[in-house]
Amino acid sequence: MSKKASMHKEEKHEKGQHKQPADEQPLGIDPEVSSGEASEGACQESDAKVQELEKALEEAQQQAEKYRGEMMRFAADFENFRKQKERELQAAGTRSIENTIRELLPLVDDMKRVMEHAPDDLEQSGEARPYLEGVELLWKNLLKWFERKGVKQIEACGQKLDVNFHEAITQVDHPDAEPDTVIEEYQTGYVMGDKVLRHAKVIVAR
């Protein structure tokens, strides 16, 4: 055998000795142990993420509940404010009507006196009669407007004196009336709902 062939054979032998099988793992590394550690680490990381998300969700729910409570309080406060303003506006409107009616009452009294005390010859006069009829029509229209606003006349004649509605200006002897009975109305009184706009001025039996 030639020297060259002998050297080639030795090289092939050395290469064969250093070649590592495909399925052989590096020394000191257990495939099963390495895989288990990686899986355990992944589970721990996943659990940490879940706990972090659960904590964030709990905080978000608490914050949402806080905002919900604040919104409910705000809505309740706004509703109370709205109702209060409605009551104030209604009360202001009622006071305005009351003041207007009080200012009109003397005019109503004057028209009533004109009709009650007009001389018979004046009522029969062709020239004066249209004016008296006009006064009467205006008086009735005012009373109708009063009724639409909830204003009513206070009953007086024949009633027992009630200081809540009547103001006695004098007392007189009367054979047919019981004591403290209203026998004459001097000035008509008016109420609006349960509020007295003006007491009826009356004469009562002694």
Swiss-Prot record:
Provide a GO CC annotation, any one.
Answer: cytoplasm
What InterPro entries does the record point to? GrpE (IPR000740), GrpE_coiled_coil (IPR013805), GrpE_head (IPR009012)
Return the Gene3D superfamilies for the record: 3.90.20.20, Head domain of nucleotide exchange factor GrpE
Biological process (GO) annotations held by this record are:
protein folding
> How is this protein organized at the quaternary level?
Homodimer.
State the function annotated in the UniProt record.
Participates actively in the response to hyperosmotic and heat shock by preventing the aggregation of stress-denatured proteins, in association with DnaK and GrpE. It is the nucleotide exchange factor for DnaK and may function as a thermosensor. Unfolded proteins bind initially to DnaJ; upon interaction with the DnaJ-bound protein, DnaK hydrolyzes its bound ATP, resulting in the formation of a stable complex. GrpE releases ADP from DnaK; ATP binding to DnaK triggers the release of the substrate protein, thus completing the reaction cycle.
Similarity remark: Belongs to the GrpE family.
Which protein, by its recorded name, is this?
Protein GrpE
Specify the species.
Answer: Prosthecochloris aestuarii (strain DSM 271 / SK 413)
